[in-house]
């Protein structure tokens, strides 16, 4: 639960050996829905289960698509002069920028996400010092995942993307919304290949966000 009016359901998984044992999946889902009662609830569901989620009252918004690429053998990329690492003094502005691209203010989450040791965070600032983009990458069990990647335009998103992949070994994953054509251009330009997709759905109204700034969502599991 991010606020009193928005929450997100993720990690909705039951081990295969228990899937036909009792009503575990049903009870997990019911508990999540009861906990988030009164909220607009978001989720990224597997495409095969869309009709099941519709029966629970969820509305289809769009597909989020995971792309995979390899960059450790393609030379070094430079960091643009307008890109800087996380500075606590910028925290309020970062939270405000994030809110343009996410259905709820998520102050506590971002403070933890920004300070996680294995994450690398970069921010793009204009000549006046205003934040015009933000991107983070984290090491995973298999490779690295970028998320979020928000930017005012393609040029800024690309500069952040290139900064984030510097020195990263193994696969790099980026989860993009199909609603942003420029995000599709970015993954095509760097020869990333689609490997998975989900359906973004909401229990109530579909949030009005700055979709053209969303070049990569944070995670499938947390929104």
What residue spans do the PLM features occupy?
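Glycine/small-residue-rich loop that forms an oxyanion/phosphate-binding "nest" at active or ligand-binding sites
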Residues: 25-46, 50, 62-71
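Conserved active-site tyrosine of GNAT-family acetyltransferases
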Residues: 52-58, 187
């Amino acid at each position: 639960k991010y606020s009193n009016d928005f929450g997100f359901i993720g990690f909705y998984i039951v081990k295969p050996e228990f899937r036909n044992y009792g009503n575990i999946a049903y009870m997990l889902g019911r508990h999540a829905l009861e906990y988030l009662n009164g909220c607009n609830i978001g989720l990224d569901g597997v495409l095969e289960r869309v009709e099941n989620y519709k029966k629970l009252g969820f509305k289809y918004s769009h597909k989020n698509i995971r792309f995979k690429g390899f960059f450790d053998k393609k030379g070094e990329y430079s960091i643009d002069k307008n890109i800087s690492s996380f500075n606590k003094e910028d925290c309020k502005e970062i939270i405000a920028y994030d809110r343009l691209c996410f259905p709820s203010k998520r102050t506590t989450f971002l403070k933890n996400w920004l300070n996680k040791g294995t994450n690398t965070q970069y921010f793009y600032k204009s000549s006046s010092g205003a934040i015009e983009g933000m991107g983070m990458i984290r090491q995973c069990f298999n490779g690295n995942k970028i998320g979020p990647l928000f930017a005012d335009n393609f040029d800024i998103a690309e500069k952040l993307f290139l900064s984030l992949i510097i020195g990263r070994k193994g696969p790099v994953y980026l989860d993009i919304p199909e609603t942003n054509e420029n995000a599709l251009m970015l993954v095509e330009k760097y020869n990333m290949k689609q490997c998975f997709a989900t359906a973004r759905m909401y229990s109530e109204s579909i949030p009005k966000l700055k979709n053209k700034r969303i070049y990569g969502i944070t995670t499938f599991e947390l929104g």
